Amino acid sequence: MAKQNIFDNEVFFEGYKDLRNREKNANNLFEIPALFSLLPELKGLRILDLGCGFGEHCKDYIRMGAEKVVGIDISEKMLEVAKAENSDPKITYINLAMEDLNVIDEEFDLVISSLALHYIEDFDGVLKNINNLLAKDGYFIFSQESPLSTCFSGGERWTRDENGNKLHLNLTNYGREKEASSEWFVEGVKRYHRMFSTIVNSLVDAGFSVERMVEPLPNEEILAKYPDYEDLFHKPDFLLVKAKKNK
């Protein structure tokens, strides 16, 4: 199966970096707080960060007491930034695709992945490798784009009133699990759509029990500052899952 490395495209990389630096950033407002709310006590834990990107979270995990962190990413450009800006003696960065986790010969107490799995074709294979890397009773915590977003395959995403206000989401082809190419900074960015049931069943089949799922929504403080995020009550942007290894 093909491994996607869109982040080493110079145009994509610069566009993505600019997006993550903006104050009005859905990742910082919703996804990251939700992800951190699912974390257990990190003191003394061995952590694997899949798709670690710039490495900010790897550094956060060390500050929170982790014994060691291994961050992997397929993007050399991302890891250059991680090593320059978020290095630590307890952090190891490895240039590796998630599909190749089987080459890692270590054991971890916690595996974390932030917004990477919807770029992966072999979801089931990656989950099995994660389970193999986890210690007994270890946890896998991840975020991804909502399946209500990954099912989108063109046309008008929203029905709007005469003033352009969003009335409701136009949901189509939710049950058609597929690869979809879209334009995001550059053309040809591939995402893989899976239904909620597929995500849960794949986790169970890989030896996990699902303990919690979160679809973060804006609070009143965020809405007062960024009223456009009202549309998240129609369609949350993110899905987060906390799963425990049970076999």
What residue ranges belong to the model's regions?
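A short acidic, Gly/Pro-enriched loop at the edge of an enzyme's catalytic core
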Residues: 102-110
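Short alpha-helix
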Residues: 179, 190-214
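A short SAM/SAH-binding and catalytic strip from SAM-dependent methyltransferases
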Residues: 110-123
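Class I SAM-dependent methyltransferase SAM/SAH-binding core
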Residues: 48-50, 54-101
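Conserved class I S-adenosyl-L-methionine
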Residues: 1-42, 56-60, 78-81, 140-177
